[in-house]
């Protein structure tokens, strides 16, 4: 599972997920999976989608993960009264804005890449689209 090795602070405020995304172009591979929706992507979802893609391409080609879960999410245990401080860190998320390229792939045909990204998209909590590298 992906998570930071060290952080400056153990817990962070909830914050808001507004604004426009960086990393909107396919820069490493030939094909990419781009987010259309906005949301939080957990480390487990990132890993599940990666596994689905790598199985679909039968371990050929190369896959790049363009997102990293760097925000800790805390939860209080069941049946605990309110108050008494912030809960414990339970999992890590990456905040995703529309237009962000989540995964990239190279070394496979477009048909195989489309199929692999379709399997990966089923594991994600927002809508995505298939994109190709634009050559200037």
From Swiss-Prot:
Sorted UniProt keywords: Ribonucleoprotein, Ribosomal protein, RNA-binding, rRNA-binding, tRNA-binding
Primary gene name: rplP
Name under which the protein is recorded: Large ribosomal subunit protein uL16
This protein's record includes keyword Lipoprotein: no
GO molecular function per UniProt: rRNA binding; structural constituent of ribosome; tRNA binding
Pfam families xrefs: Ribosomal_L16
Membership in a protein family: Belongs to the universal ribosomal protein uL16 family.
GO CC terms, sorted: cytosolic large ribosomal subunit
Subunit field text: Part of the 50S ribosomal subunit.
Organism: Glaesserella parasuis serovar 5 (strain SH0165)
GO terms, biological process: translation
Role summary: Binds 23S rRNA and is also seen to make contacts with the A and possibly P site tRNAs.
